[in-house]
Curated annotation (Swiss-Prot):
Sorted UniProt keywords: Glycoprotein, Membrane, Transmembrane, Transmembrane helix
GO cellular component term of the entry, any: membrane
Spans traversing the lipid bilayer: 29-49, 61-81, 103-123, 142-162, 183-203, 223-243
Region ranges (Disordered): 1-21
Localization: Membrane
Role of this protein: Lipid-translocating exporter-like protein; part of the gene cluster that mediates the biosynthesis of hydroxamate-containing siderophores that play a critical role in virulence via intracellular iron acquisition during macrophage infection.
Primary site of residence: membrane
Membrane topology: Multi-pass membrane protein
Protein name from the UniProt record: Lipid-translocating exporter-like protein RTA1
Origin: domain of life: Eukaryota
Pathways involved: Siderophore biosynthesis
Amino acid sequence: MSPESKKITAHGSTSMPLSRTSKPQKFTIPLTVGAIFSVIGFLQRFFLASGKGDVQSLYTLSTMFILGAGPTYAGADYFICGRLFSFVPSAAPMSPIRVVRTFITFDVLAEVCVWTGAGLLAGAHTDTAARYKIGLNLIRAAMITQAFLFTSFVAILASFHVRVCALRAEWSVTSNGGTGRRFMMVVHSLYASSIFIIIRSAYHIAGHSFRTNEQPFLICEASLMLLNTAMFNVFHPGHILPIDSRVYVGIDGQERANETIEGAFTDSRPLLQKILDPLDVKGLFSRDKKRWHDPTAELEMDINSTLYAALT
């Protein structure tokens, strides 16, 4: 059995717990679909290597599903990040709804480019060299877009990490600050997943330009996606973050429920500002750094006053 086919079996066995270990949440769907895409893609490539079926059809399908798995996994990371931001809203650098909406939009565009480019690339021998070039450029554009998205994503996640560290200094000391949930494990998992996908995008950018033998790239692809799938099965966000999206951590580190918490993250900016600055980059610099806000406004506190009271 080839290395790729061995990883197919592993992918299938690790993807199933994603959909049954906890109540399904939004991020569970793309995690499972991404694993299924990987399995389908490598199965098609296995049949191609075995000389079974139509060569062109198998190559086209395998390329589309293998390359399409990455953006699908990325979508899961964006949903997990949004859920994390809504759980600790006081440390969120921007609205979780805004983060998910913006990244998912560009992720869908990358997925479309991958599938279109793979189709053109696979059937290029029946047409002109121009078709091959267009398909190759579409795949490159998709991989570059995904690498840029995850670089930005890591920067936003790092900003959240820094804010959480500052906030937890004010919480009562427990195993994880004021809440018993190991939500920082979700942050670390997102860091790892981002690194996997950035590496994957980088070698696909190089691979479609310079490779002469695709086996090392397929093994690397399967290994990274297998690690990503296994990691989220071991550290499943659905087991760490509360299922009820109305539950959040207040500025005192205690969990509470808020019936209107989803409304606290609606984008109330003018339409033109939403279009020109969908990620609310301006908000990163104009936000009042002196105050942390509880969504219910019941526990709003001035950090400087708190520090002064603690010192006196």
